[in-house]
């Protein structure tokens, strides 16, 4: 899908030029580091997950529906996620060295991973939904558009929307 409401791409549209970071996501894939499964038409094998060297699931998010369950995990900023992972590992090492050290809390992780980072921008309205999502796995995050009022040469004003909430299709506006 896309911001224009296009449907998901078929296999013939999935060719891409990889960035260095994307190449890291595929490193060691031939070494049986992850399970493989048949693709949509059983013609090829594909990885169940990518053998990524960073927490790609948090960075790219996930969305899906299955029988009796669903998930909708938003995208996050790569730098913030790495900082959160470093804090988590440092805490784990400190706990091994000193068993009296408390496990890192969600609030402490949120000092590094502040909130989801949506690709189309927008402003998160309120913070309680983010906190709820991180603490319980369930939360409601409301995103507002970012807009400006511009004055045209003829004196008329117009509203220019610069950032849309994630998931909003332009043509539906």
What are these regions (language model features)?
Residues 141-173:
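Gly/Lys-enriched N-terminal cap/neck module of very large, oligomeric protein machines
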């Amino acid at each position: 899908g896309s911001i224009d409401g296009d449907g998901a791409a078929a296999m013939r549209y999935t060719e891409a030029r990889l960035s260095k970071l994307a190449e890291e996501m595929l490193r060691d894939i031939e070494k049986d580091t992850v399970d493989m499964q048949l693709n949509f038409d059983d013609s090829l094998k594909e990885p169940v997950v990518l053998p990524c060297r960073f927490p790609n699931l948090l960075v790219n998010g996930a969305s899906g529906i299955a029988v009796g369950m669903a998930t909708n995990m938003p995208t996050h900023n790569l730098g913030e996620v790495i900082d959160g992972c470093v804090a988590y590992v440092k805490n784990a090492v400190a706990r091994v060295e000193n068993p009296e050290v408390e496990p890192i809390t969600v609030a402490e992780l949120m000092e590094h991973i502040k909130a989801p980072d949506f690709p189309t921008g927008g402003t998160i309205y309120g913070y309680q939904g983010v906190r709820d999502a991180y603490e319980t796995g369930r939360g409601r995050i409301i995103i507002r558009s970012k807009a400006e009022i511009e004055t045209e040469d003829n004196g008329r004003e117009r509203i220019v929307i610069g950032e849309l909430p994630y998931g909003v299709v332009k043509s539906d506006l």
